[in-house]
């Protein structure tokens, strides 16, 4: 039995090796216009939410909005978004089979559900601000490098940790 699969990509989700700083709105429609820190999230849905809730002991209160943190005794805030960007393709073989069957037998499409396929890719998108700067990830921000260092460490800790309660005792 020979099986041939032919797909045409309609949209390909971005691959981010470590992290990326970009305009939120450019990364995905509906995100803020500010600069954001983006990384791929290989964990299950709501894992980052649970991690932040536990790490900052927020008890479910304002977990994804205006989370305060300190860098060199200065208070910053971050908000985050769990974003899905699917890779979408058209599968030609099922489409062609349905066309052939429809012409030969006047049948309704049999493989209609297989005409397209989607594979979800999840990302964590973080924006940072403080009382004096609306966009701490902007190249013009005096805090950009400090904030980037903090976010890199936060990402590294999140990805390396399975039991988030350990973080409370570590900090």
Task: Label each residue range with its predicted role.
Residues 37-42, 127-130:
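Short beta-strand-to-loop capping motifs
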Residues 31, 43, 118-121:
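Short, solvent-exposed coil/turn segments at beta-strand boundaries
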Residues 84-171:
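Extracytoplasmic electrostatic interaction patches
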Residues 17, 47-53, 160-169:
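Glycine-rich, compositionally biased intrinsically disordered regions
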Residues 43-113:
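Structured domain cores in non-transmembrane regions
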Residues 8-12:
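Bacterial signal peptide processing site
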Residues 16-37:
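Post-signal peptide N-terminal segment of mature Sec-exported envelope proteins
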Residues 3-6:
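C-terminal motif of bacterial Sec signal peptides marking the signal peptidase cleavage site
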């Amino acid at each position: 039995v020979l099986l041939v699969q032919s797909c045409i990509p309609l949209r390909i989700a971005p691959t981010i090796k470590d992290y990326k700083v970009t305009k939120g709105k450019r990364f995905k429609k509906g995100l803020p216009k500010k600069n954001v820190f983006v990384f791929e999230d290989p964990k299950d849905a709501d894992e980052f939410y649970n991690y932040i809730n536990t790490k900052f002991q927020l008890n479910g209160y304002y977990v994804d909005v205006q989370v305060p943190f300190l860098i060199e005794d200065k208070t910053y805030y971050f908000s985050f978004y769990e974003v899905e960007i699917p890779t979408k393709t058209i599968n030609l073989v099922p489409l062609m089979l349905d066309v052939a069957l429809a012409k030969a037998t006047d049948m309704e499409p049999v493989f209609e559900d297989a005409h397209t396929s989607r594979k979800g890719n999840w990302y964590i998108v973080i924006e940072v601000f403080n009382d004096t700067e609306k966009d701490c990830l902007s190249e013009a921000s005096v805090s950009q490098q400090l904030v980037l260092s903090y976010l890199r460490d936060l990402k590294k800790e999140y990805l390396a940790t399975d039991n988030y309660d350990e973080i409370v005792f570590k900090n």
